[in-house]
Amino acid sequence: MTLTATMVVDKSFKIGEIDKRIYGSFIEHLGRAVYEGIYEPGHPDGDEQGFRKDVIRLVQELQVPLVRYPGGNFVSGYNWEDGVGPVSERPKRLDLAWRTTETNEIGTNEFVDWAKKVGAEVNMAVNLGSRGVDAARNLVEYCNHPSGSYWSDLRISHGYKDPHNIKTWCLGNEMDGPWQIGQKTAEEYGRVAAEAGKVMKLVDPSIELVACGSSNSKMATFADWEATVLDHTYDYVDYISLHTYYGNRDDDLANYLAQSMDMDEFIRSVIAIADYVKAKKRSKKTIHLSFDEWNVWFHSNEADRQITPWSVAPPLLEDIYTFEDALLVGSMLITLLKHADRVKIACLAQLVNVIAPIMTEKGGPAWKQTIFYPYMHASVYGRGVALQAQISSPKYDSKDFTDVPYLDAAVVHLEEAEEVTIFAVNKHQTESLNLQCDMRSFEGYHVLEHIVLEHENMKATNQGREQVTPHHNGDSAIDQGRLTANLAKLSWNVIRLGKK
């Protein structure tokens, strides 16, 4: 039996312009993300700075526009001064967040160099855990002030004459978490974030600031935290952050794939809170959202408990992703696109080795995890304006969710290229979906390609050999303004339409 879903798409019905930064990612000094990940001196494919060129090529393939750095939990115990100046003089430190030893071979300047090589901006986090206002303003001065001051001249003495001009800054990380170094109440964090933001913008008024939201929507303080923090910081910050991770610990596929609905509700809740504070303050300014940690994370939990403390770059959080994980990541990307009017930054956490789309072997190859593909497709083809599609789909209920549409879809219009891209996930476990899509406002368009990611084994991974890869043999056609597409059971689909 084939089920039918319908969709109406009109170029006049817009959600909003997609900020390319929603396809951002994250590199933390954690596990093998930096050392043996992006940086491995002596690797056969290393460059003159020790950065792995195979990793650089894969990041470029993803077209990652922005990378958050250096944490994460790590940043709440990090002294940024440890990572600048002559490498031989940099101290080794205990990283209390992950109970490892940090060598500080890579720091601010080297990471900026790497970001330029991959074509990404840096989204820099400051330490508001063990440190505060003074260290934050000094780091902005070091990075962004041209010359003529202590910290800017120190940067110049370190070989960086031109300022880095980092434009996006995070005011700490997950400050409500009991695991966080320097955990704070909402009042405590709101005050220090406001003061840090104030002085950072005095140093460089052009920067944008992200305030920490709750560590996740299940925190007891969620909602109250956001409202209190924004009450203090509203005049200084531009974004409030969201973090969420999902897993399939119960091996319940229907419930697992429905978790993108939880992400959607989380976004709607934070928008409502931000707009409440806007109304309360009679403000003309709108706070946008930075979903700067999101992914699947659960596979590596048991292995991480076996790691010896205080080692350098141990294999932490090395989830090996399955095909079913790629489907949920696809739905999470669709969810972000559905909120393109308010979610302006997002960071897939993370980028290399640590809960990542890219894995490396020491001295050996780098390879693509299953989740690489939906992330790459969205980043490459999901530029332009998100359209408000009217979707009618059969639905199902799961353990934690009701009325879950089998069809999850988002539509993007890139007007200057005369291209439309439909991203679609069929969550049905046994039946294909016949998609009937009214595209009358896109006269003269035809199907450029229909990319499909599918696999019979939900637990298939790309470790050892690439089993989960997309093909370009999707079944779709457009006739007289009506697109008909067959969406295979449990599949990720990218249907590209154009006039060329």
UniProtKB/Swiss-Prot annotation:
List ligand-binding residues for alpha-L-arabinofuranose: E28, N73, N173, Y245, E293, Q350
* GO terms for biological process, alphabetical: arabinan catabolic process; L-arabinose metabolic process
Q: Name one GO molecular function term.
A: alpha-L-arabinofuranosidase activity
Tell me the enzyme class: hydrolase
EC number(s) recorded for this UniProt protein? 3.2.1.55
Query: Which residues are annotated as active site?
Result: E174 (proton donor/acceptor), E293 (nucleophile)
Q: Name one Pfam family in it.
A: Alpha-L-AF_C
| Site-annotated residues for Important for substrate recognition | W297, Q350
Pathway assignment = Glycan metabolism; L-arabinan degradation
* Keywords assigned by UniProt, alphabetized: Carbohydrate metabolism, Cytoplasm, Glycosidase, Hydrolase
The reaction(s) annotated as catalysed by this protein in its Swiss-Prot or TrEMBL entry are: Hydrolysis of terminal non-reducing alpha-L-arabinofuranoside residues in alpha-L-arabinosides
Subunit annotation: Homohexamer; trimer of dimers.
Q: What does this protein do?
A: Involved in the degradation of arabinan and is a key enzyme in the complete degradation of the plant cell wall. Catalyzes the cleavage of terminal alpha-(1->5)-arabinofuranosyl bonds in different hemicellulosic homopolysaccharides (branched and debranched arabinans).
Q: Which family does it belong to?
A: Belongs to the glycosyl hydrolase 51 family.
**Descriptive protein name:** Intracellular exo-alpha-(1->5)-L-arabinofuranosidase
Gene name of this polypeptide:
abfA
